[in-house]
Amino acid sequence: MSFDPTGYTLAHEHLHIDLSGFKNNVDCRLDQYAFICQEMNDLMTRGVRNVIEMTNRYMGRNAQFMLDVMRETGINVVACTGYYQDAFFPEHVATRSVQELAQEMVDEIEQGIDGTELKAGIIAEIGTSEGKITPLEEKVFIAAALAHNQTGRPISTHTSFSTMGLEQLALLQAHGVDLSRVTVGHCDLKDNLDNILKMIDLGAYVQFDTIGKNSYYPDEKRIAMLHALRDRGLLNRVMLSMDITRRSHLKANGGYGYDYLLTTFIPQLRQSGFSQADVDVMLRENPSQFFQ
């Protein structure tokens, strides 16, 4: 796994994802190589060196695409292994054992993905449904815990609209996972400070990783929650990203692009009173400690 701890890291992104069949919308097929390479070059000029790519099997993952992007742009892409959430599971999640699902993850970590030399560096994006953990999602979380315990690779989760994060952590902890090796995704989609504080108190990292998606939750509220965490001295448990998933998110297609976090959100954060050191903690120091 290539990772540069001296640069910034986007903790939850997608470079190649295809949920278009499920969502009946071609915009959800993110696969435009030239446009994405240009955006990765732009990120490199702004100090980003690592992108954590959260597209796992059956979400449209493309290992060769990631390898090609790395070779062309020089950016590090950390690939993942796992299963997303119940609505997107292939049939065999129901029929295979927990141990078999865990072994699939271990194989992608230790041997490689889809016959390529690219190995998964993280167990992710493992998810739960809104307001509940289904039996199959619980099965995947247990398998992820087994794979983590065998390989030591960290776990990054998907919460649906900032629900079930505490329950995810309880499930992983019950199966032997050190919660300092877990980061909870999508904590920034509702007024969620109380739960965020509890998750951090348990030892986990939290991600504000849908930055720019103001139709879900406005960035000014994200900034207010980040201030509340800063005031409590808890920025050492926060990571940032944007969760780009659609063609329309790309700058070439009229979207805000992967660098919106750096060109728009961080300046807003700085203007609100955050120091450059605060920014560096969330974008460099925390990811470097967590993902390596």
Curated annotation (Swiss-Prot):
Its cofactor is Zn(2+). Keywords: Hydrolase, Metal-binding, Zinc. The gene is php. The keyword NADP does not apply. Activity is higher in the enzyme containing Mn(2+) than that containing Zn(2+). Zn(2+) 2 binds at residues 125, 158, 186. InterPro entries: AryldialkylPase_Zn-BS, Metal_Hydrolase, Phosphotriesterase. Catalyzes the hydrolysis of phosphorylated glyceryl acetates in which the presence of a phosphate group is required for the enzymatic hydrolysis. Hydrolyzes a dibutyl glycerol derivative suggesting it acts on phosphoglycerol substrates with a butyrate leaving group. Also active with aromatic acetates and propionates. No activity with various sugar phosphates, with various nitrophenylphosphate or nitrophenylphosphonate derivatives, or with phosphorylated or non-phosphorylated sugar lactones tested. Does not hydrolyze non-phosphorylated carboxyesters with long chain leaving groups. This is Phosphotriesterase homology protein. Belongs to the metallo-dependent hydrolases superfamily. Phosphotriesterase family. Monomer. Zn(2+) 1 binds at residues 12, 14, 125, 243. It holds the Pfam family PTE. Beta-D-glucose binds at residues 148-149, 176, 178, 181, 280, 284. GO terms for molecular function: hydrolase activity, acting on ester bonds; zinc ion binding. GO terms for biological process: catabolic process. Binds 2 Zn(2+) ions per subunit. Its EC number is 3.1.-.-.
